[in-house]
Amino acid sequence: MSLLSIDDIFIPTSDLLNHSHNNKRLNYNQAKQTLLLNMNGSYPSSNNPISNGEPCDAKSNHLGGEMHNGVGSKLENGILKKAPDIPHITNNIIPLSNVLKFYTQEAYKQLTTAIENLSSTKDTENDSSRKKFFLNLIISLRQDFIKIYTLVKWASSSKDISKLIDLLNWFRSQDFYFEQLGYGLNELNRYSGAKLPNSDIITSLEVFIKKRPQLPSYNLISTPPISSEKTLEVLKDLNLTLMTRMALINNLPKRFINNYEIRDGRVYFTIQNEFQVSVTVGNDLIIEQEDDYYKSPFYFIDFKFLFGINPETALITHKDNKIITKLPKSSFQNLEKIVNTVLLNSGLGGLYDLLHKYSISFKLYLIARQLKDISINSKWRNNIQFKYQNGKSLILINYWSSHYLSRNWKSFIELGIDKNYNLNFRWFKNGTYELNHGISGIFDRNNIKKQSDASDEQQNNIEPNEESLEDLREDNNEDESEPQDLSVDLILNIIVNKHSEMLMDKIYETIVKRLSDQEEYCSFISCHQLLLKLTPNKSVVFAINPLTGFFYFIDPSPIQNQVTKKINTQSSNHKNKPFFSENDMVENIVNQLIQLKLEMFNKEINNKLITSGWINNEIIKLNDYETIKLSNFLNGDNFNNSNYNKIQFYRCKNWPLSWFLSNLVSGDNFRTFWWVARIKSIKGEWKIQWVQQLKFDQEMETSDELTLDYKFFNNLSSLCSNMIIDHMILEELQTKKIQYIQKQSKEKAAELLNKFQIDEVKEENIKPEETNNPFVYESIIMLYNDNRLLPVSNSSTSLFLKIKLITLNNSTQMKLKLFGNLRNIPNTLAETFNQLNLHISKSQNYFEINDIVNLSNKINDSSIKETRLLDSILLKLNVLNELIKVLYQLDQNNIEIVNSSIDSIQIKIDEESNNLTIKLPEMDEKFSLLSSNTESNEMKLIISYLNKYLSMTSKVQENEIIGIIKYFKEITPIVKTIKSVRATLDEKNKMKLSNGLSKLNFDVEFQNLNLIQFVYFLNHTNVNSNKKILKDKIVIKLNFMRNRFNKQDRLLLKLSMKDNLNSRNLKYKKLFELIYKGISEVDTTNGSKITKLNYDFIVDSSLINELMIKITDAFILFLSDNA
């Protein structure tokens, strides 16, 4: 059971006052009056019943019925019977008990659910929100129960309302019955079969007047024949009447004035090349006023066309009178009806207009037939399309139908009738109608021949207006001269030839505008052919086929065939454009022609380079950013249009990796640009790491275009190789952080040498095969000496590197010479310099270092990641530099040099020790010390410590080498002392334990270069166990120190025994007494001193040997006394 709201229950009470059929709101009195007017009875319990607005008897009505207590009754066979009861409505009425039960259950359910929810949310919600929720529920229930209360109050009077609902329903049904009765009565008037025909008033009048009816005879009554005289008389009268009528007509059409003839009772109008028509009149009335024309109009007699199809030529001809076209019978009858109607309404003016249009339309029909024939059986097959619109008297001819420019009716010719009703044409192309085309008299064969032979004048740049075909006027159609046969083929030839010529003119103008400095690139051979210069030595003929509209090359190559295909296909850049214009096509054609010129010129250069031994690399593709690096060298040359510039990369077999010759060919001219570049692939992209434009001789640079002959390509490899070698040398100088000035010309290099007062020594020992071989290349680079190459005090701030390339036995050799000033050389070092195999002229303060590099082997070695060409010569320079510095320092410190070579120097330490060998650094290496096989282990250990120190030092200065040498002189007495102690122990230490182990052992420990420990191990056995060996250690430390109070710069030795002062060594008290006693007995008569500082002693290095021997003897004495 669905829930009803109080509003739903009250709806029936409102419907009591709503009339459903008319949708009008009625009050209670109106409803009562309607009841009284439409029912057979009166309203019950009314004292004043109403009938048609007037009071009536309460026991009777105006229809003869009676009402009693609201219930109708009638008499049947004299018996009074009750009318049927009004039907009771029970639909959509719900018992009140059901509503009360539902609301009670719903209220109980909502209260129960709310109480359960509130009990479960006691901990999660505060009391105020829970109370508010419960209050809202009670308020909503209260509102529902108020509605229930209202419903109960309303139900107390529900019986009366139910009667009103039944009464309203009965009213509606009675209203429906009365409407149906009205419709039925109205249908009685439409019974046509029951109607009588109208009276024949006309026949009645005729009988009344003539006393007989006028009935047709149906040719049953024969008519007498008309005599010839009567006929001639009538025709003569008609001729006279027609002459008079024609003389009195003021608005006779212009072309009818002198082109008519009156004979045989009719007027013959003959319009040359179009038609002939004859008309007459039905009586002899003379019409003087136009308003009286209807009294005697003209009637149509005969018609024929004065043109037709010539069976010999299949063309439309006018000149042969025998070739006329008569209409079929059905067409003639149809035309007769139309012409008579036109003559009645519009007279002769309307006749001319009608027949002129008819003739032109028939010409168009014949043209359409001719078009259909030539589109199938001629050269125009598959090249034209046409539409014949008969209703508009219009023919559309789409020429070049296979060409994308004209496909889908983008270029066509309209053949139709202009505003003077003459046969004319319009030309639609490039999205608009072409009005200034310069073609006239297209339907005159003589004019067509003249135009096909004559060239058109220059076209005016006037945009055509969108006009209808009827607004066009051609002067030639006003000419009444007899035209020749009309040929659609010739008309199409005129149009397509004109269009082709206009396209070629546009292409030529665009090319000349684009290549303004290349006038010889394009020239006309004929109006449909252009001569294009693709390379300095090759040209091609570019033409258009007027029949199809396609372009082609004469005697094309494969690449030209590809370009032809692109030209005759719509460009992909314009496929999404809503309209593809002629300018777009011309732009695409010019772009393709310039691209062809670019490809052909590039191919010619590519063939010459490959023939010369170059290898083309097609893998390298530069992005825009890298390409700009090349354009920076062009100094204003047009390099922006990358679509018409092509860059190719080449290399020679003997070149290093990543080096390429870059060639740029411009499509706008015949200029070429050349670079040498190093290009590498980094993360999938090609990057230019270095680039330099090639500079040719002065004659080539002054001309706009290089002469690409055999001499050019023969010298190109050498020029590029020289540039690569130069860059590799300069890059190597940069890597070594040597500053330089770029290579100098011979004249400028000579000036620099004179400025620095350097006289270059001529080469000696030149091989005979070199004298007859010219130098391939020679340059001089000035190096900046910042005291790293050579000491400035011994040289100058500038050195010179001379590079000379020669070719011997098919291999390229590079001769390097490094030279400059060299002065202030110590006299004692002259022999040392001679041992370095360097050419030094002390008298001229000059030196030079020579080296030879075989480039064929050097740069072709792919395993070498970075080719180093200057390693050898810079190594010699570095050796010379270090040697000068070291020898100068050794000479200043009076250090004796025993021997020297190109990579090492032997220094004398003292008379007893071995010589110290110092290895000079090579390139980025550092100084190192070399030990001989006869050195002691202690000396080898010291040398290893020193080499480690030198390797960890970022930069070793020459004074540090002097310090190392001085350290060796200071450490040598200690090394000798170690040897003496070992010798003493070997000689005097004879005491052994029971197991044969020596009671006294000695060892030396180097903690670092400044701390040396003399360790004495005392071995003894345990008292409880003779097998267990115990070992005690006595450590004597030696380290260098400086006496700050002594002005002499000499090192002293500090002897320390503090580490032995512990409780474990109390048993060795006697030993320490013996040690101190031995120290005090050391001889100091030679001026050396021993200074005691508590448990430490400061000793001169000269006394260390004797001191340590005394201490060792103390150990031996102590052990012997305890034995």
UniProtKB/Swiss-Prot annotation:
The keyword Nucleus applies. Signal peptide: none annotated. The keyword tRNA-binding does not apply. Keywords: Activator, Nucleus, Transcription, Transcription regulation. It comes from the Eukaryota. Its main location: nucleus. One of its GO terms (molecular function) is transcription coregulator activity. One of its GO terms (cellular component) is core mediator complex. Residues 450-484 are annotated as: Disordered. One of its GO terms (biological process) is regulation of transcription by RNA polymerase II. It is found in: Nucleus. Component of the Mediator complex. Component of the Mediator complex, a coactivator involved in the regulated transcription of nearly all RNA polymerase II-dependent genes. Mediator functions as a bridge to convey information from gene-specific regulatory proteins to the basal RNA polymerase II transcription machinery. Mediator is recruited to promoters by direct interactions with regulatory proteins and serves as a scaffold for the assembly of a functional preinitiation complex with RNA polymerase II and the general transcription factors. Belongs to the Mediator complex subunit 14 family. This is Mediator of RNA polymerase II transcription subunit 14. It comes from Debaryomyces hansenii (strain ATCC 36239 / CBS 767 / BCRC 21394 / JCM 1990 / NBRC 0083 / IGC 2968).
